[in-house]
Structure formats: structure tokens, C-alpha cells
Amino acid sequence: MNIRPIEDADLLEVQRVAQVTWLHAYKEIYPEKAILTFLSQAYSLDRLRDLLRTDSNKLRRLFYVVATEDGIVGYGELVERGFAEYELTRIYLLPEFQGKGMGKRLLNQLINDVYPLRQMFAWVEKENGGGRSFYESMQFHVEEEIEDNFFGTVTHLLKYVREWE
């Protein structure tokens, strides 16, 4: 397993991983049409190329992939939101690679590659039990709950926060 910054050659595989993981994680929460609409926007090749260019400066965004002999099996993105404050905007692994410590290794790599780090947060769908368990196992706690609208579906998001001194 190799955790590294995303490269242009990874974009199609990241799209594939996004489609599989989003349908797996959210199929019981959101309508499939909403998920597919989101994926077509957030994971279009143009959007991913924009993220790749932004990532190249390594100052405000880290976008890493988890690569194995099977190809790209996961990815994570960390975005600076303020001094020493970062939002984990996405972290996903293919279902067959979950529960093997890869997500923890990916998150720890992202954490290790930013300095200074005072606070990290992530918005998690309240109904996403697997996601919630992951963040809780990584010492995040719920700080806030908001109501959101995901392509016509009313949903509740939890803000998970972890702080460092």
C-alpha cells in the first residue's frame, strides 16, 4: 500500500472509487439520482483536474490516494480553512478495503503532512454509521448538528472535530 499525492493518471480511478463508495455508503440515505448528480458534478474530470492543480502548491489542500497492486482503492482530501484549521472534505475506501486500517493510515498521513495543526473537522451524514464510527475511533467528537439539503433530500450533518495543542 502506498499513500501519495494524487496525480493526473489517477483521475479516472478516483472517479470509479467515488462512484462505488458513494453508492455503497449512501444508497440507504439518499436517492440514487441525487448521488449520481452529485458525483457528476463533484467528480467530473474538469473538477478533479482543478483540485489537482490546486494541490500542487501543497499549501492549502492535500489530496492523497491509496494505491495498491489493485490500483487506486481510496482517497482523502484535507483543505485549510483557517490558521492551523483543516477540513477533511472527503475520505473514502472501496468497501472491500474498509476495516483493514487503511483509512486510519490515510488520515494519519494527512495529519502528519500539515503543520501547524490546531483543529480538524469533517461533516458526516448523521445516518452514516460507518463514517461516524471511523471518526469516533480517530478521537473526533460531535460538536454541531445542522440540517442540509442534498439535491432535494433533507438531511442532517454532524460536525466531527478533533483538536491538538
Identify the role of each PLM range.
Residues 111, 136-145:
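Conserved acetyl-CoA-binding loop of GNAT-fold acetyltransferases
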Residues 5-9, 16-96, 107-113, 148, ...:
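Acetyl-CoA-dependent GNAT
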Residues 157-165:
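Terminal substrate-recognition subdomain of acyl/acetyltransferases
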Residues 1-3:
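Extreme N-terminal starter segment of soluble prokaryotic enzymes
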Residues 71, 90-108, 125-133, 137-138:
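Conserved glycine-rich acetyl-CoA-binding loop
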Residues 114-124:
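Conserved GNAT acetyl-CoA-binding A-motif
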Residues 122-132, 149-154:
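Conserved beta-strand-loop-alpha-helix junction that forms the acyl-donor binding cleft
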